[in-house]
């Protein structure tokens, strides 16, 4: 009696002063087997494990049906065997050490299953302080598929606009199926986008032309080339000409008054400085020569909810220029959408191509810095982690991304990422020789292993996969 009295007093003290509660607990272990013998073996093994820890499991003879119903997630316990446990004791049965990631908002998207608990991962990137994202992985690890899955989910769940920079021509089947606009940019294409396009909201300042002039300077720097870039005199005459050719448009902002590259070329020729003629000569092949693809007014619908810029067939001479112009088109779309409250999502596949050139790399860094303020959500896909950390400026892209989907990584990249993101050796195992659609998800301060086993018998899978045999099959359907 004295022992029971001390135990009762200790329990009362816990309940009164140590924030403990009393729970009546029914603990059930469900055993299954394909045969009666297999079931007996499983019950015996479970009982043996429990006995090692001084716990006796009692078989529910003649109550199997009630035990099964009580084990199902129906909140209906039909077994009247209970034991009183305090909060601390009850918590042992619940795996609180398993990190979960589930946000119940109306714009939360699916990102796979928790590899530890098999629970859904549902998150909304807009709730992050910085929604910028990266998808990193070796070829064949599922980078493009992960991006397409998010694109499809965002299209169905949110009202966001979606813009894709597609250097490999992989996104057209999905975009066409969603009734989006695929803009095929190539020397033989009849679809054109005008690099001189501008809108009234192009800059957060009162003068949008200043920011547009900065883009045109970057464009000319890419065209003129050279290690030193544009000379100060060349920058001066280009800036002067930019202000001249936009006067007519801002006086009467109709599509017919939007300048084209040829207007800049002609304005440069009319200047007295020899440097102006030097820049004009460099532009001539893009105006009157065989590379005059961008010397046209825009003749496609760039305001469709989902737009894909397919630059696969751009030659080596044009690809750098094409990527820079696409970046500017995206910026124009983001600024135009600010007043509508929409959050444009911008996907850059093979992002390492953008980081190889100084001008496109600098523009990408600006996008990462400024998109959040304008409501944009950029996502970069790359297999080259070293390119992301090639310079302090480009490294800002990495540091300003609060969401990273990390798939299988090469050995060298694993070590770089482990150091950069403070990944433990155990966590690193989830991106070491991992299967397709498996890896680590970084969402704010949460790091979670995930798996995404997408059903292969769906039409959506056939138009999203990049596997050679399945791509042709999906294209036919």
Tell me what each language-model feature is.
Residues 130:
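Short coil/loop residues immediately preceding or within conserved phosphate-binding loops
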Residues 1-98:
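Extended, folded cores of ATP/NTP-driven motor/assembly subunits in large transport
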Residues 382:
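H-loop/switch region of ABC-family ATPase nucleotide-binding domains
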Residues 141-194:
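Walker A/P-loop NTP-binding active-site region of P-loop NTPases
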Residues 1, 64-96, 138-139, 385-477:
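C-terminal regions of RecA-like/P-loop NTPase motor modules
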Residues 28-38, 138-141, 312-315, 352:
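A generic structural motif
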Residues 55-56, 66-121, 126-127, 172-181, ...:
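P-loop NTPase motor domains
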Residues 135:
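Hydrophobic anchor at the beta1->P-loop junction of P-loop NTPases
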């Amino acid at each position: 009696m004295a022992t029971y009295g001390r135990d009762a007093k200790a329990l009362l003290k816990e309940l009164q002063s140590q924030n403990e509660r009393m729970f009546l607990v029914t603990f059930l272990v469900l055993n299954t087997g394909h045969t009666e013998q297999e079931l007996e073996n499983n019950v015996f093994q479970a009982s043996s494990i429990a006995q090692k820890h001084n716990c006796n499991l009692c078989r529910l003879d003649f109550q199997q049906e009630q035990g099964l119903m009580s084990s199902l997630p129906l909140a209906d316990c039909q077994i009247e065997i209970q034991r009183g446990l305090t909060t601390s004791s009850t918590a042992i049965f619940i795996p609180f050490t398993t990190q979960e990631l589930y946000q119940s908002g109306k714009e939360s998207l699916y990102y796979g299953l928790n590899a530890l608990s098999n629970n859904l991962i549902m998150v909304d990137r807009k709730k992050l302080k910085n929604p910028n994202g990266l998808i990193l992985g070796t070829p064949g690890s599922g980078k493009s598929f992960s991006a397409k899955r998010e694109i499809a989910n965002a299209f169905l769940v949110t009202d966001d606009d979606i813009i894709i920079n597609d250097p490999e021509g992989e996104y057209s089947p999905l975009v066409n199926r969603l009734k989006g606009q695929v803009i095929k940019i190539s020397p033989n294409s009849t679809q054109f986008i005008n690099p001189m396009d501008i809108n009234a909201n192009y800059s957060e300042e009162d003068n949008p032309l200043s920011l547009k002039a900065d883009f045109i300077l970057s464009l000319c720097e890419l065209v003129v080339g050279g290690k030193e870039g544009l000379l100060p005199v060349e920058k001066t005459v280009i800036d002067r000409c930019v202000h001249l050719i936009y006067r007519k448009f801002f006086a009467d902002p109709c599509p017919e008054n939007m300048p084209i590259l040829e207007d800049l070329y002609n304005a440069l020729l009319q200047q007295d400085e020899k440097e102006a003629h030097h820049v004009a000569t460099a532009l001539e092949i893009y105006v009157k020569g065989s590379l005059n693809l961008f010397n046209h007014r825009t003749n496609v619908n760039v305001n469709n909810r989902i737009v894909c810029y397919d630059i696969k067939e751009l030659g080596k001479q044009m690809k750098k220029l094409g990527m820079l112009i696409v970046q500017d088109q995206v910026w124009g779309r983001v600024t135009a959408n600010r007043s509508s409250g929409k959050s444009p999502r911008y996907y850059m596949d093979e992002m390492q191509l953008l980081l190889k050139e100084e001008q496109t790399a600098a523009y990408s860094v600006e996008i990462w810095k400024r998109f959040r303020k304008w409501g944009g959500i950029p996502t970069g896909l790359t297999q080259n982690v070293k390119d992301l950390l090639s310079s302090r400026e480009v490294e800002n892209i990495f540091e300003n991304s609060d969401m990273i989907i990390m798939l299988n990584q090469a050995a060298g990249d694993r070590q770089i990422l482990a150091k950069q993101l403070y990944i433990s050796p155990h966590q690193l195992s989830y991106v070491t020789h991992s299967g397709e659609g498996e890896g680590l998800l970084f969402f704010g301060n949460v790091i979670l292993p995930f798996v995404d086993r997408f059903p292969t018998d769906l039409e959506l899978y056939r138009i999203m996969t990049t596997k050679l045999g399945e791509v042709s099959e999906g294209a036919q359907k």
